[in-house]
Amino acid sequence: MTTETKEQKKKMIIEHLTWDDSVNADNIKVTIEDGTAELWGSVQNYTAKMAAERDAYQVEGVRKVKNHLDIQFPPTMSLPGDGEIEAHLEKLINWNRELHAGHIHVECDQNVVTLSGTAESFWEKHVILHLANATNGVIEVNDQLRVKPPRVLNDEIIANDIREAFRRNYLIDEHQINVEVHHGSVHLRGTVPGFLVKIEANTIATYTSGVTDVVDDMTIAQ
C-alpha cells in the first residue's frame, strides 16, 4: 500500500467515523499499515468503541482493526459509584434466566469491573462480558472468567460441529476458514471476503457446545 493510498484509506475511515452519529470522533486518531487499521484515543462509551471498530472494518481495503480506544465519560455526566455498579451488574446477571450465574463474582474499583469465577459455556461468558462493558459508569472490564462446561467434548467433535455449521451458513465458504481446537479453545484462521463473514464465523464458534475460548486470526481479503 503506497503512502498516498494509506492516506486515502485513513481519510475514508475518519470520514466514516465522523459520519456515524453514535461515535464522537473528535478524540480518535487513526493509523493504517498493510491493511491493518489501528484506532487510538478515546470515545464516550462502550457502544461507541464497538461502533468505531465496525466503521473501520466497513472501509474497503481494511483487513484487520486493532481497537486501542479508551472510554472517557463526559465531565458533566453523573456516574454511579462502585457499589452501585456492582449491585446493578449482579442483578443483570442473576435476572438473566439463560445464565448460570451462581459462580460469578463481580467487583468494581474506580469504575473498573473485575469478573471472576466460572461460566458453563463460552457464549455465557460472552454475554456476561457484554453486560459488564455496557453498564453505565464502567470504563474497563478485567476478565478473569473461566469456562467450565458441564460436559467436556472431544476437540475433533467441536471442530466438526463448527465446520458443519459453516457449511449450512449461506454467508460462509467453509474452505476459506481453518478451524483448530485444543482443549476446547477454538482458533480461526484464514482470509474471508468481508467483515460480516468474520462476525458470522465468530458467532458460530462462540455458540458451539463445548467451546471454552475463541481466538480470531481471520483477515479480510483485499
Task: List the predicted regions and their residue ranges.
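N-terminal targeting leaders
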Residues: 1-222
